[in-house]
Design a protein with these regions (language model features):
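Substrate-positioning beta->alpha
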Residues: 154-157, 166-167, 176-199
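Conserved Rossmann-fold NAD(P)-dependent oxidoreductase catalytic core, especially the SDR/UDP-sugar
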Residues: 92-130
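NAD(P)-cofactor binding segment of oxidoreductase domains
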Residues: 62-106
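Conserved N-terminal Rossmann-fold NAD(P)-binding element of oxidoreductases
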Residues: 4-8
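C-terminal amphipathic/interface module of NAD(P)-dependent oxidoreductases
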Residues: 46, 50-54, 233, 240-272
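N-terminal Rossmann-fold NAD(P) dinucleotide-binding loop
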Residues: 13-14
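Conserved beta-loop-beta element that borders a ligand/cofactor-binding pocket
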Residues: 139-163
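Mid/C-terminal beta-alpha module of Rossmann-like enzyme folds, strongest
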Residues: 192-249
């Protein structure tokens, strides 16, 4: 049995915690919400209040870093925060992890680090600050990768969807919507399973894309969502070829033996 601490018991982190508990692991985690604290604790997750602002603020969070595996799930904030804020958050996470001699870290990154160059890309793509789609996220990855005293695996998730996150709803009734580019989505269930798989199989010091292997067009996903769930589709779509795109390969994680429960975004289930 491993002890696993999840920094960020949110939309992905909380279901991952339940999944790991069911597998017999000791699970700890953090939330930024005092309202969620008691509910999480009552269900068996040792939970601390912790917010990186960008320095750590909270109560009782030091014990989170006394763990076998640290799962870092801090999404970048909106563009309203100063440039470099996210990198500073990750620096403080690393500092706490190193102080506590954490041996294994999983960092939740994003496929937004890849540029939209109208091509298929995999983990070997040579990212630089000049070509990346997100300098902030790439910088965060590099902070954790540099001068490290721990095993580190990075998961670059695509669009985290399913359950209450319905892609077509975000574009319902909108005009001039991009429809002809491939989607790079992953269902919540598979994002949880993939994260757990990396821990179970000891897949350390790697970078993996977390994206369903099939890539239907955006228009097809939005239209199917509207038909099945009963809301309006987009009013109109942009002309084909206007938007740049990328198609993210999931071959590397598939080669480890991982199997997606929902390999096609057209088959995602939702609970609106």
């Amino acid at each position: 049995m491993s002890s696993i601490s999840i920094i960020g018991l949110g939309w992905l982190g909380e279901p991952l915690a339940w999944h790991l508990l069911e597998k017999g692991h000791l699970v700890k985690g953090s939330t930024t919400s005092p309202d969620k604290l008691s509910g999480l604790q009552s269900k068996g997750i040792e939970t601390a209040l912790l917010k990186f602002n960008p320095h750590p603020e909270g109560i009782g969070f030091r014990s989170l870093f006394e763990t076998d595996v640290l799962f870092v799930n801090i999404p970048p904030r909106s563009k309203s925060v100063p440039e470099g804020f996210y990198a500073e958050q990750i620096k403080f996470v690393k500092e706490l992890a190193v102080q506590s001699k954490v041996k294994k870290i999983i960092f939740v990154s994003s496929t937004s680090v890849y540029p939209d160059w109208n091509q298929k890309v995999d983990e070997s793509f040579p990212l630089t600050f000049e070509n990346t789609g997100s300098q902030g996220i790439l910088r965060a990855e590099q902070i954790l990768q540099s001068e490290k005293s721990y095993d580190l695996t990075i998961i670059r998730f695509g669009g985290l969807l399913g359950v209450d996150r319905i892609p077509g709803r975000y574009f319902s009734g909108k005009s001039n919507v991009t429809g002809d580019s491939p989607v790079n989505y992953i269902h919540q269930v598979d994002a949880v399973r993939l994260s757990s798989w990396i821990i179970e199989k000891n897949l350390w010091n790697e970078t993996f894309n977390g994206v369903a292997p099939m890539h239907p067009l955006r228009k097809d996903v939005y239209e199917k969502n509207s038909q099945e769930l009963g809301f309006a589709p987009p009013i109109s779509y942009a002309e084909d070829g206007e938007a740049m795109w990328k198609e993210i390969s999931s071959d590397k994680i598939l080669d480890t033996g991982f199997q997606f429960q929902m390999p096609d975004s057209l088959d995602f289930w939702y609970r609106p």
